[in-house]
């Protein structure tokens, strides 16, 4: 279906925030559940999706304390793992909600000097795109470490790409440079 290419897919958006990714997934036909540890984020997401008459199930929870029996075709962990204290535990908790052969996407920040300069010094202190203290460089995750944790939780790496932000046109592009942002695709085995 061209209008709803994600029809019949169940998606879990972990760390959904205000629903910025949950909403377009729902509009593309997916059955979306969005979870976030912040009740304020969940309230904002519900309010916004209700105004658009979208059927998104928002729950205030983290994957570690989520009490549902559902299994999902796709799990989105977008820009969240660099904020958790134990990435391995987080991936373990997340992966238990993934169907066999299901896909998990993880977008995060690499642990490099360049990522420190761009994501913290540049984005927080110089450009003020983010509040100061949003990121802790110690929590950034190298792709090799993420792969190790994923493989230990029955997830096979399918692909890893760099995500490059172009400040001139305000767009993200997929590329080879993983030194700042990257996105990994894993499959449940």
Regions found by a protein language model. Give the residues of each.
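Conserved SAM-binding loop
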Residues: 2-4, 9-116, 143-146, 184-188
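Short low-complexity, flexible loop/linker segments enriched in glycine and/or proline
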Residues: 48-54, 121-122, 172-176
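Acceptor-substrate binding/catalytic loop of class I
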Residues: 108, 128-145
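Residue-level marker for beta-strand->alpha-helix junctions and adjacent short loops that shape enzyme
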Residues: 111, 165-167
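Short, flexible, mixed-charge acidic loops at enzyme active sites
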Residues: 116-125
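Short alpha-helix
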Residues: 138-154, 160
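Core SAM-dependent methyltransferase catalytic element
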Residues: 171-189
């Amino acid at each position: 279906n061209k209008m709803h290419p994600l029809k019949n897919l169940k998606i879990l958006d972990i760390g959904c925030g205000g629903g910025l990714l949950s909403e377009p997934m729902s509009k593309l036909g997916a059955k979306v559940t969005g979870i976030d540890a912040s009740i304020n984020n969940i309230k904002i997401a519900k309010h916004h999706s209700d105004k658009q008459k979208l059927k998104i199930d928002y729950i205030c929870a983290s994957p570690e304390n989520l009490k549902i029996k559902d299994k999902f075709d796709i799990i989105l962990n977008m820009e969240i793992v660099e904020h958790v204290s134990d990435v391995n535990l987080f991936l373990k908790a997340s992966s238990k909600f993934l169907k066999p052969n299901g896909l998990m996407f993880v977008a995060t920040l690499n642990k490099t000097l360049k990522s420190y300069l761009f994501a913290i010094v540049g984005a927080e202190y110089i450009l003020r795109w983010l509040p100061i203290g949003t990121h802790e460089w110690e929590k950034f995750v190298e792709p090799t470490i993420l792969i190790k944790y994923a493989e230990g939780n029955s997830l096979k790496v399918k692909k890893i790409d760099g995500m490059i932000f172009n400040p001139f046109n305000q767009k993200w592009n997929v590329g080879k440079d993983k030194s700042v942002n990257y996105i990994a695709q894993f499959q449940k085995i």
